[in-house]
């Protein structure tokens, strides 16, 4: 295996680390969370509608924010603008940080942004379809990218509907 002779041992703040016990190895698997960017994408040339996308692997009517991974040497701001361009072909004209949100289930840290974007929407091969949703139709969910939606709504003084427990993806009246 990639990590031979490893076992979990107590370490910092009660977290477990997996050191290698091979003589002289010294390797420790830290299992740090992976940073992921997410975009609350406001289409400024479509009356401020919010773009939600559905991945081919997801059930019908399951839509979420555009998300993606950082590339080596890339800032999170550049990454979220690139992901919006790659996934839906929109040009980011403004990128503003909303916050960072833990997503323990996937061991990720979601870095949420409000991205104002414009252009002709064209989906890449990852996505099956998209919806443009009026901001008041959004319904935040209790984890990760849903918290970015909540914070975006609160920053605009919007009434935020009660968060639906157990819903891991965006919910909108669409």
At which residue positions do the language-model features occur?
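Acidic, metal-coordinating catalytic segment for phosphate/diphosphate chemistry
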Residues: 1-39
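A short coil-to-beta-strand element that immediately follows conserved catalytic motifs
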Residues: 11, 91-99
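Short loop segments at secondary-structure junctions
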Residues: 43-47, 56, 116-120, 135-137
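Active-site-adjacent beta-strand/loop module that shapes the phosphate/pyrophosphate-binding cleft
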Residues: 99-126, 131, 135, 152
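Conserved Nudix-box catalytic region and its N-terminal flanking loop in Nudix hydrolases
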Residues: 32-33, 43-86
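Long C-terminal interaction/binding lobes of large macromolecular proteins
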Residues: 119, 132-174
């Amino acid at each position: 295996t990639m990590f031979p002779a490893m076992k979990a041992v107590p370490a910092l703040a009660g977290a477990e680390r997996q050191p290698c016990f091979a003589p002289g190895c010294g390797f420790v698997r830290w299992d740090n969370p992976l940073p992921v960017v997410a975009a609350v994408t406001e289409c400024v040339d479509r009356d401020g509608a919010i773009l939600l996308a559905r991945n081919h692997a997801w059930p019908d009517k399951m839509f979420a924010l555009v998300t993606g991974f950082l590339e080596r040497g890339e800032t999170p701001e550049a990454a979220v603008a690139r992901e919006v361009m790659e996934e839906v072909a929109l040009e980011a004209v403004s990128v503003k940080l909303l916050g960072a949100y833990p997503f323990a289930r996937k061991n990720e840290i979601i870095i949420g942004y409000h991205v104002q974007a414009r252009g002709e929407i064209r989906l890449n091969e990852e996505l099956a379809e998209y919806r443009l949703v009026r901001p008041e139709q959004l319904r935040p969910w209790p984890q990760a990218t849903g918290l970015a939606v909540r914070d975006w709504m609160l920053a605009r003084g919007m009434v935020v509907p009660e968060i639906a427990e157990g819903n891991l993806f965006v919910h909108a009246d669409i």
